[in-house]
Amino acid sequence: MERKRVWRTCLTRSAAAVTGVVFLAAAFVPVVCGAASAADLQPVQLAKPNPDNPAIRLLEKRSSSREFASQPLPVEVLSNLLWAAWGINRPNGHRTAPSANNKQDIDVYAVLPDGAYLYDAKASQLKPVAAGDFRALAGSQPFVKEAPLNLVYVSDYAKLGQSTEEMSAFFSGAHTGLIAENVYIYCASEGLATVVRAMVDKPALAKALKLRPDQHITLSQTVGYPKR
């Protein structure tokens, strides 16, 4: 008899506890889910961009251009451009553009009139890869072979670890976009013209750059002075 009384007491307390949890959870539902619908919200009027903000001024100038002068870029401009794109900006080796889990899978190649080079951010150098004018391989548009510089972005899938092919393509595309936008912003600050492009002869260019099978060209970006 005593055992039944104990079990009955335990069950009663358990039921009360469960009921309390249910009521407590129900009390939080409006907070988590939101009691109101979107129809109850009012538009938020945003302020106009502040022209005194340096970042705003640069973004106002950011644009794509497909007309380039053949004038070469000075070494100082080329150096700053590459650092802005994908340079090391902290003692721990992190870059001017983020990458997922700091994989740093993107390699930046500079295709110049005399040859193709690989940007080495740690050494602050352009390392020769191949001699010759490969600019025409960096795109199908006529201006590509007239501009003094074509940046070619290459993702090293080996650095992305065990990602699936789909995820590797996603990460490499996102990382490339971040770097390319850095180039756009730097070009806006220097009065340079630039345009990012996907129309690239990837097989021929991969051969010229001596890429491995697990290195994939993502995009190309033409840079130069505006054509006057």
Per-range role (PLM):
Residues 1-13:
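N-terminal secretory signal peptides that target proteins for export/translocation
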Residues 36-147:
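N-terminal amphipathic, basic helical "cap/leader" segment at the start of enzyme domains
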Residues 62, 81, 108, 149-205:
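Small-aliphatic-rich amphipathic alpha-helix that forms the alpha element of a beta-alpha
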Residues 49, 154-156, 224-226:
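Generic beta-structure capping elements
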Residues 211-228:
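A glycine-rich helix N-cap at a beta->alpha junction
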Residues 191, 210-211:
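Glycine-centered helix-boundary capping/hinge motifs
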Residues 11-23:
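Sec-dependent signal peptide hydrophobic core
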Residues 21-35:
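C-terminal segment of classical bacterial N-terminal signal peptides
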